[in-house]
Amino acid sequence: MSNETPTTLATQIERARTFRDLHAGERPLVLPNAWDPASARVVEEAGAAAVATTSAGVGWGLGFGDGERLSRERAVELIARVVATVDVPVTADIEAGYGEGAEDVAATVRGVLAAGAVGVNLEDASHAAGGPTVRSTEENAARIAAARQAADEVGVPLFINARTDVYLASVGEPETRLNETLERAAAYVAAGADGVFVPGVVDFETVTALVKGIEAPLNVMVWPGAPSVEEFAERGVARISVGAAIAQSVHALTRRAAREVLTSGTYTSFAEGLSYPELNGLFERRA
């Protein structure tokens, strides 16, 4: 399979069904988010059943900040390259859909599907006017409905993971956030979302309430110090993402190694790198 070979519709539909089934397994679907073809291939080789992108990592890798500073065209091009590099399903972080109108979201979804992805993360944040702010439930539900219609027209059972930033953006008073999240989740699922992503919360009490109150698979985002995959599994979490954490770790290593060689003239930071033959071998079959 060449990195220039497009994914056929039949293959894409099969991967979409596989990806959907991964949300109903005995263990949560764990997604160590990637940001370019190389990281995606490494994640696949490590044993990931699917590859998810991180918008922050993608943006940084292309020289842009997070928050829809990247154009739709650049984002879709990157997704196509990731899809062509791996053999597992790919789900794309499309932020808020790259545009203010529901028609913009539909256009982005069509582009992502043309690139071969089988899932999207679509958030209710708005990055316009210096944001981010959180859109109204009604407005974002309409955007999700537009995404669903676009996917249905293509004929791919796209997995729409509706992200709500109520906790991440500290919307309202703390005591109101659970109900606000549950109300948004219900509206988003009714509009066509297949799963709900609630970043910014990992405590067991809230996570358990979210699992019980949302009629769709729950996705949480983890960071150092968060509960383990097994602990989340015991509470019914269906999907676990790491967001930009791996990209951040890689860039931290880059800075540490650069500072070491530039200041002390030593190279100990390089010691745990993957070997040239191993890395090169990951991509030889794509030639």
State what each model feature region is:
Residues 3-242, 248-251, 255-256:
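Alpha/beta enzyme core
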Residues 270-287:
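A short, charged, Gly/Pro-tolerant segment at domain boundaries
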